Amino acid sequence: ADTLIRKVKIAGIAPPTGQDDGEKAEALITAIETLRQTDDDWYMLLTDQDGDDYVKALCAWAEGTEPTEAELGAGEEDHRKFYFGQTDNLSLAVKNRRCALIYTDTENLDEEADAAYLGNVGPFYPQSVTWKFKVPQGITMPAITSAQREALEEANVNFLTEEYKKQYVKNGVCCDGEFIDNQLGADYIASYMREELYAVLLENAKVPYTDAGFALVAGAVFATLNRATDLGIIARDPESDAGVFSVV
């Protein structure tokens, strides 16, 4: 489909250094922020580091990439990110926003389940699709008990499971419990609306503080929300077939 995006950037950095994994994780975050100073035109992040300290640091970093209203008002640009990671820790507790984890057994970490999961569903972006019930290629079913599966669900960690003789990833959620498609959809709306608003400002000699000017701005807002409706991010009214949203 024309909407499928398959752009990948590979950034090589020196191995993180430090006295322990905590310091090395901080060094990795510093390296990522250094990269952003010259190239911030990307959205989703994967790394080859799977240790607990790395995963926790990357999740916290991703959550912090979304600027606050005050920061936006002060002129900070919005280059929010989303982190996909994998873990072999059944007890890992991460509740950050803007990140998603998938569990894999220690001996299968080299299968890179996070990359397989993102590669399986990510190309549909920005179209809204359910991240549950997906079947990434090339990853092994984890050898875990029903109690451990329940614990992973409670912790909002995704995992490959088998139910009714069907294998699929459960539950398609971020670490804070939000569905992945909802978070990605909200980010897309923010990004597309910014593009539309900048187009209005750049293509018009002046956007007056009048009804005509408000109409130009409103046009950008409605164009964004209608686009999100077409992509399935916003639901349609079954009777009118219009997107279910309101602009105040």
Predicted feature locations:
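Surface-exposed assembly/interface segments
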Residues: A1-V248
